[in-house]
A protein has these predicted regions:
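Conserved alpha-helical scaffold segments that buttress catalytic/binding sites
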Residues: 1-206
């Protein structure tokens, strides 16, 4: 992506690097999840240009009959939700459980996307959405009826009922979240995985 759209809009005019990379999707296992060589997120933070390297590939794999998607920038979750919906992996209108240090609930400028056309979903995901606004369009389009956000110790008390898709940002394990014991976070997420229809996991490299 070379134009100032999607995740490439952040600090675009001030940056020396003007393009970010979207890795391809492969089917594989956890062994295929590895760091690539390309910049996938780039912004200026406190006068320092951050050039975050993403994954070599985005990975789809199955474990215990569940489909799991692993990717870098969190807005890719929107594409994988639509792909999974088209494949009948979950029912439209179920709940979303979002485990993340951040709420990611900002509103995009545009909600125009054909959910039945994955090429258009790809365009929308990468050229309209960014890492902070990908949940609202899924709610507005009725893909999910509601979202439960787990971003605190209180949030981990959630005991979901009914069908849900689980969305995880690995920044839930960042140092800023260390006020919640690591094993507690890990075990709660393991419990949520057991009941999920589909699981999306963002590495969030920035």
């Amino acid at each position: 992506i070379e134009e100032p759209v999607g995740n490439n809009v952040f600090s675009y005019d001030e940056r020396t690097n003007k393009k970010i990379f979207v890795p391809k999707l492969i089917k594989g296992t956890l062994d295929d999840v590895s760091l690539g060589e390309n910049i996938v997120f780039n912004e200026i933070d406190e006068d320092t240009e951050i050039k975050a390297i993403g994954l070599k590939n985005l990975v789809q794999y199955e474990i215990d009959g569940k489909v799991v998607y692993i990717f870098d920038n969190h807005n890719h979750a929107f594409y994988f939700w639509m792909k999974s919906l088209q494949e009948g992996l979950f029912n439209k209108g179920c709940r979303l459980i979002h485990v993340d240090q951040h709420k990611d609930m900002r509103k995009p400028d545009d909600y125009t996307v054909d959910l039945d056309n994955l090429d258009d979903v790809f365009r929308y995901t990468n050229k309209v959405l960014n890492v902070g606004n990908f949940i609202q369009p899924a709610l507005k389009k009725g893909v999910f009826c509601d979202v439960d956000i787990i971003d605190s110790s209180y949030g981990f008390d959630l005991k979901p009922e009914g069908e849900y898709v689980l969305d995880i940002d690995l920044d839930i394990f960042s140092k800023d979240m260390d006020y919640i014991p690591y094993d507690f976070r890990l075990n709660k997420i393991k419990e949520l995985i057991k009941g999920a229809k589909v699981i999306t996991i963002a590495s969030s490299p920035y």
